[in-house]
Curated annotation (Swiss-Prot):
Catalytic activity: D-glyceraldehyde 3-phosphate = dihydroxyacetone phosphate
Annotated family: Belongs to the triosephosphate isomerase family.
The protein's name: Triosephosphate isomerase
UniProt subunit comment: Homotetramer; dimer of dimers.
Binding site for substrate: N9, F10, K11, I146, G180, A201, S202
Protein role: Involved in the gluconeogenesis. Catalyzes stereospecifically the conversion of dihydroxyacetone phosphate (DHAP) to D-glyceraldehyde-3-phosphate (G3P).
Length: 228
């Protein structure tokens, strides 16, 4: 994982799977290569292998279960996503919560497998406790802003600044800001406030011109880095 971090969560929009999902992955890859920026995509579990075999950018799962291998019908384990070609996974997204004991077990196994991990939290007070588990990054997202088009950068900047204070208590863990990120200006502000990057979904997955939106994101991130 490299700063600036831009993580695109495909979720399960119409543009996230099948031919359209693959096209979206290639659009993201094109922007990443043209701007020399590492952009991570979190794709549906059924798309991991197909996408990972088609692009050179990091492909993540959107969720993993902390259950052991064995009789767990429908579970998505760290071993399964590794075998499918994923480089890492989101954990504990507000739309896919996991129990603390399962998350801890999943993290330990992901580390053994060499997989990156992004723990999602809904408030800054949880940033330091989750960072102590030593994931690759912690993503803070106020759930009330997710998918609204109202960015955390503008509506709740104190969430980012407080999260920055919390992440500094633990060395070696990145901080990602998310929820309502829709423009390069949102990305710029989030990073100027101290985050290492942003997470986004609907702003790109539902965009008429996703390449244009993503380029705007990257330009905002680069501008913030240049001014640090």
């Amino acid at each position: 994982m490299k700063v600036p971090i831009i993580l695109v969560n495909f979720k399960v929009y119409e543009t996230s799977y099948g031919r359209r999902g693959l096209e979206m992955a290639k659009i993201v890859e094109k922007v990443a290569l043209e701007t020399s920026t590492e952009i991570i995509i979190a794709v549906p579990a059924t798309m991991i292998t197909r996408v990972a075999e088609s692009v050179t950018i990091p492909v993540y799962a959107q969720h993993v279960d902390g259950v052991p291998e064995g009789a767990h019908t429908g579970a998505v384990t760290p071993e399964l996503i590794k075998d499918a070609g994923a480089k890492g996974s989101l954990l504990n997204h507000s739309e896919r919560r996991v129990r603390m004991d399962e998350m801890d077990d999943a993290l330990k196994r992901m580390k053994k497998l060499g997989l990156e991990s992004v723990i999602c939290v809904d408030r800054y007070e949880l940033v330091a406790p989750m960072a102590l588990l030593k994931p690759t990054a912690v993503l803070v997202e106020p759930p009330e802003l997710i998918g609204t088009g109202v960015s955390v950068s503008k509506a709740r900047p104190e969430v980012i600044t407080s999260a920055v204070d919390e992440i500094r208590k633990v060395q070696g863990v990145y901080l990602i800001a998310g929820a309502g990120i829709t423009s390069g200006e949102d990305v710029y502000v989030a990073m100027k406030l101290g985050s290492d990057g942003v997470g986004a979904a609907s702003a790109i997955m539902k965009a008429k011109e996703p390449q244009k939106v993503l380029l705007d994101f990257v330009n905002g991130a680069i501008r913030a880095l240049e001014e640090r």
